[in-house]
Amino acid sequence: MDAIFDRVVREFFPNTTIPFWKKWLFRTAFGNKVFSRLIYNERLVNKNGVEWVNAVVELLELKCESEHHQFNNIPEHGATVVISNHPTVIDGLSLIHTVSRVRSDIKIIANHVLPIIFPQVSELTIGIENMAGKMSHKKFREMNDHLRKGGVLIICPAGKLANWSLSGLQEHKWNPGFLQLAMRNNTALVPIHITGANSKIYYLTATFWRQLSNMMVIREALRHHGKTMKINIGQQIALSSFKEYNKDLSAAANVCLTHLQSIAKNGPAMLDTIAPQELEPGKEELISAIEECEILRQFEDGRKLVIYRCNTNRTSPIIDELGALTRTLLSRYWCRNW
């Protein structure tokens, strides 16, 4: 763990000699012991990528609540840019966990230190050194390549956590880079609003000493144990909405932020939106029927053993789905062996 801590310190303070007292303070804030308990938890061993993220969410008993119908706003396939506000240190986990219910081809723009601390998410992250500044051409190309392959790219355009003020959390100004990516690749643009907050100690530390608050991320994440994150998945924003801004992407990015904050409060949309495609016929009933099943056992890897009690007096979406899957598998088998 000391090796990871030392590397994190070098990344945050390159070519700098850190005094003993300051390094001791950083080590205390980082929390090697709590970090070890998390990273070596048996429920996370041999897991990577989305599977690891979902296991961490389950381990923390973190509840990411979204309205069921809102998942229709995330396209099932095709290039997609997801934009979100950034109130807490675990927004990335919450966003990946939420989007992964629809898509698996996910990458997220994150601080370059994240995959150093958690190598399990390296396949999901595109690391940026200056999150609030301009990105390198290499990283921009990596994002474009992922979108050209039809993947999902998650971005918090503020680039850093919201500040605490007397009037509440204040989101930083959004970097318009996400608009360049969306328009260049003609992607779906999905806004997601997260309702949550870090501890007041964290915000106070960030106000007076940002470097120390950066080292508190692990401890702060664990403080969200058992909490609920309200995730509001908005309708896709039509890219045609930005034509009137005459290439003033900074102004367009500001409107996107205003739009997100408005729909989070059930206010009016500030931009044109695209109505979601409905789920396939019967899928909503199928999902509802599965959720009503009795859980017999919860496995450590997140899987569940459930029992379904069929009411023979009415049609069963689960039996219908099993029948459809059986027919599909048999037809594929006979085609291969014809």
Predicted regions and their residues:
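Membrane-anchoring hydrophobic helices of lipid-metabolizing enzymes
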Residues: 1-80, 90-94, 101
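Non-catalytic C-terminal accessory region of glycerolipid acyltransferases
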Residues: 2-5, 137-285
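Catalytic core of membrane glycerolipid acyltransferases/transacylases, capturing the structured
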Residues: 32-37, 80-134
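Short, flexible loop segments at the rims of nucleotide/cofactor-binding pockets, characterized by
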Residues: 57-63, 85, 129-134, 167-168
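Hydrophobic beta-strand scaffold residues
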Residues: 64, 106-108, 153, 189
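Pre-Walker A (Motif I) flank of P-loop NTPase domains
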Residues: 76-85, 151, 155
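Conserved N-terminal entry element of GNAT/NAT acetyltransferase domains
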Residues: 274-313
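A conserved beta-strand-loop-helix scaffold within acyl/acetyltransferase catalytic domains
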Residues: 299-338
